[in-house]
Amino acid sequence: MKRTPHLLAIQSHVVFGHAGNSAAVFPMQRIGVNVWPLNTVQFSNHTQYGQWAGEVLAPAQIPALVEGISNIGELGHCDAVLSGYLGSAEQGRAILAGVERIKAVNPKALYLCDPVMGHPEKGCIVPPEVSAFLLEEAAARADILCPNQLELDSFCGRRAQSLEDCVNMARSLLKRGPQVVVVKHLAYPGRAEDQFEMLLVTAEHSWHLRRPLLAFPRQPVGVGDLTSGLFLARVMLGDSWVQAFEFTAAAVHEVLLETQACASYELQLVRAQDRIAHPRVRFEAQLLAL
């Protein structure tokens, strides 16, 4: 029997709706990955509602929980770590300590960093100390880095002016340590307004993918969290970078189609679960000569 991979997901959680782990855990489980959720914050709902209740996990709890897993002899079974929204830079450093602890017992474990800072259309949503931590410390420790356009621009200290510019900027991040960069949401000047674009960049190659841009009265939250989670899960299940990239685009599109059909502000993960596992659509990534 083929072994089921295990993934430690360290990011935010909302009681109502879908963001952070609440957007990523169930889809990753649905496609065949055991997920260990470690919630950096627990809020009543995501912050785009404008009001919420809840609290941030004390940073010291993160290594303590990782050590607790070690104490029962299970830490070596962890095949990957996913990190997302951070409540503080101190929390981020605690996550890196946890990643180091896991890699000490399983050197093959992957670390995907989703450097959540904000949204190209909404601006930065995290404190300056968190942005600085992501830019100066986290990127160098990640095997996979998954920024959106705002975050890519922040890493490189300038705004991208073209698709080629985005490729060059993503490739510059590889020099800091990651094996691969996935730009989850491209927003460069001159792009097609009716398309949602993504980018996959390794040291040798780059791939560009487009899917239809679906219209919503209010853009659902958690799409980036869903994207990062599914990409890592598919890699853990044996996909190549490109296969995982194409699958993720298709599965996320299926969720958005269902969400749009329901006229919902929250992602319709449960209703779309079969199409997450078996997308009906396929978007082919184009190999760029860049």
From Swiss-Prot:
Q: Which UniProt keywords apply?
A: ATP-binding, Kinase, Magnesium, Nucleotide-binding, Transferase
Q: Give the record's pathway.
A: Cofactor metabolism; pyridoxal 5'-phosphate salvage; pyridoxal 5'-phosphate from pyridoxal: step 1/1
- Give one GO biological process term: pyridoxal 5'-phosphate salvage
Question: Reaction catalysed by this chain?
Answer: pyridoxal + ATP = pyridoxal 5'-phosphate + ADP + H(+)
Residues annotated as binding ATP are: D114, E151, K184, R211, P212, L213, L214
InterPro entries (alphabetical): PM/HMP-P_kinase-1 (IPR013749), PyrdxlKinase (IPR004625), Pyridoxal_kinase_PdxY (IPR023685), Ribokinase-like (IPR029056)
Enzyme type, top EC level: transferase
GO CC annotations, alphabetized: cytosol
Subunit composition and interactions: Homodimer.
Family, according to the entry, reads as follows: Belongs to the pyridoxine kinase family. PdxY subfamily.
**PANTHER family the UniProt entry points to:** PYRIDOXAL KINASE
NCBIfam families attached here? PRK05756.1 (NF004398), pyridox_kin (TIGR00687)
Instruction: Give the protein's recorded name.
Output: Pyridoxal kinase PdxY
Q: Tell me the organism.
A: Pseudomonas putida (strain GB-1)
Q: Which gene encodes it?
A: pdxY
